C-alpha cells in the first residue's frame, strides 16, 4: 500500500513508474506468503509481467525525456495528438501495469489476490485496495500525459524507438501466440481448477 500511496503524489513520471514497481512487488510478496498454488503461480506471473511492462514504461519515460528534457508530468499533455504512436504504446503499457483483463498484468494479480483470499481474507481485501490505488495513479498519469492540454509539441517517436517499442506489446498482450504457457489463460484455468478440486 505504501508504494501505491507514494506513487499517487509523484509529480515526476520516472518516480511514479518506480513507485508503481514497488507496489507491484507487493503482489509477489503476497503470493509467496499465501503459500498455495494460486498465490505462488500468481507471484511468478507478476514477476514476469512486471519485468516486461515496467521496462517498457521506463522506455516510454526515456522517449519523452529525450524530447522534452523533463520528467515532470505537469509539463506534458496532449501527446495523444502530438505523438500518437508514443501515446498508443504508453496507453497499452499503462493498462497492462494496472492489470486490465486481457493483458499480462491481470492474470498474476488476480491469482495473487485469489491466493491471499484463500489464506487470509483480510490480506485479500488489502490487496484489492492496492489494485484500486494502482488504477487511480496510472490512469491519472495517462490522462495528464496523453490528453491534457499540451504546453509544447514534441515530435512523435522516430523509427528506431517505434521498432523497439513495437516488440514489447506481444508478450504483454498474452504471449499465447508463441506457445508461452506462463501467461496462457488455459494454464490459469487449469491451475485454478486443480486447486479448487483439492
Cite the ranges covered by each PLM segment.
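Cytoplasmic/organellar membrane-interface segments at the starts of transmembrane helices
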Residues: 83-86, 140-198
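Hydrophobic transmembrane alpha-helices and their helix-loop junctions in integral membrane proteins
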Residues: 1-149, 157, 162
Amino acid at each position: 500500500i505504501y508504494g501505491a500511496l507514494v506513487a499517487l503524489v509523484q509529480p515526476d513520471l520516472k518516480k511514479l513508474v518506480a513507485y508503481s514497481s514497488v507496489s507491484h512487488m507487493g503482489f509477489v510478496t503476497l503470493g509467496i506468503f499465501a503459500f498455495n498454488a494460486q498465490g505462488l503461480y500468481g507471484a511468478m506471473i507478476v514477476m514476469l509481467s512486471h519485468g516486461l511492462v515496467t521496462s517498457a514504461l521506463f522506455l516510454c519515460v526515456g522517449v519523452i525525456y529525450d524530447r522534452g528534457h523533463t520528467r515532470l508530468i505537469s509539463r506534458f499533455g496532449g501527446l495523444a495528438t502530438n505523438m500518437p504512436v508514443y501515446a498508443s504504446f504508453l496507453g497499452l503499457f499503462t493498462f497492462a501495469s494496472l492489470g486490465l483483463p486481457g493483458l499480462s498484468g491481470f492474470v498474476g494479480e488476480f491469482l495473487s489476490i485469489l491466493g491471499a483470499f484463500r489464506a487470509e481474507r483480510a490480506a485479500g481485501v488489502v490487496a484489492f485496495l492496492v489494485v484500486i490505488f494502482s488504477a487511480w495513479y496510472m490512469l491519472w498519469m495517462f490522462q495528464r500525459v496523453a490528453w491534457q492540454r499540451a504546453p509544447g509539441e514534441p515530435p512523435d517517436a522516430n523509427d528506431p524507438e517505434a521498432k523497439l517499442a513495437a516488440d514489447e506489446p506481444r508478450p504483454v498482450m498474452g504471449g499465447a501466440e508463441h506457445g508461452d504457457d506462463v501467461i496462457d489463460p488455459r494454464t490459469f484455468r487449469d491451475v485454478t481448477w486443480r486447486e479448487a478440486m483439492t
